[in-house]
Amino acid sequence: MAGSPMVELFAGELRRARGAAGLSQEALAQQISYSAALVAAVEQGRRLPRPEFTTRCDEALGTDGLLSRIREKLSREVLLPWFREWVRIEQEATALRSYQPLVVPGLLQTEEYARALHVGASPLAGEAMEQQVTARIERQAVLHQASPPQLVAVVDEYVLRRPVGGADVMRAQLRHLAELSRLHHVHLHVVPAAVGSYPGLNGAFVVATTPDGDDVAYLDNQLQGHVVSHGPDVLSLVRTWESVRAEALSARQSTELIEEAAQAWT
């Protein structure tokens, strides 16, 4: 990401605004409660700015949200190329139907859980990994916007039992799921282990309903993900979704199971 146009734009505008305010890197760092080393790294394009850092810089430098607007575009650039189209669809969707047999869906992950997944399964490391973790967490803003999509997420019970990141991470993650289930537009369902074999075990997928009423889907694999818009393929996934949903517990029963599983992670 270093050297990309958006990184250079952000770094340049931060340097310009700081200079216009008559502040040294050390003085700005003191005002925003971050280290001077981090300010220097961001201005040199070696570190990507986090949301809170950016907001504090906007406030301290009186830039009227300019840095935050640049960072919003920068966060999209950080996304893996094949995922950018789906994030755009996700942000505009009126409804999302998600199924995950292995891990907590990205929109519902805590930062610690997302980081643990990357540590255990991603080829990325260091700053590159942190960029992806940050991008994943920022995507979740779609659930808290003025007109959020309705999200119906189904997970396999094994997702609640898989020790991603250890007991503390899992306990916090499952408590987070229980809290999200109280939002009026978020509905969580769990397929109990007793069900045995069912269609969803063939793999995870998400179906998004666009503002014009069309359905579009997303599939992931070991190499990359891709958007599915071919009518018959989308219809097949919708039918699989209906089969999966039919095997799941009710929202209330699922929340009870999630809370029970959270208490078991001690």
What do these predicted regions represent?
Residues S68-Y99:
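Short, charged recognition helix plus adjacent turn
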